[in-house]
């Protein structure tokens, strides 16, 4: 290799995962014409360097958002445990859920949500070994915040259905602190013990 650092942790991870072997196997199946074009575009060096970019400097696989420590391969469900998530990120998630609940009239819209940005920012704010369980926990809070808003709107207007407009002042009484005060741990999940969303 002329442009590949074979001592890097990225290269070693590439080799351990069998990706390098896959590159070599693909090369063996190329016709002479394909091999010529392959070499014109940089050959194995280019392919290996591009694949190495999928790992951080520690050799940990990066997810689609460029965050290491999020690979669950071979971990079963051991990462699905509750852990402490800072008030800052719980508040950011609550504010986002509330904004999007109002904006989308209670419907979860995967096209316009900013939740992935909050998760990524959170993940980058903690050590790699805390990212999976922290993300699991933040997702638990997110679901409970959304559920509390649904319950509040439904209590004020029993005929309301997600997608229909509603009086957004109903949610003035729904705060992160109120929702969290009703949550209890149930195994690896957060559930509501009880909630008072009287208007």
Where are these regions (language model features)?
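Type III/flagellar secretion export determinants
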Residues: 1-199
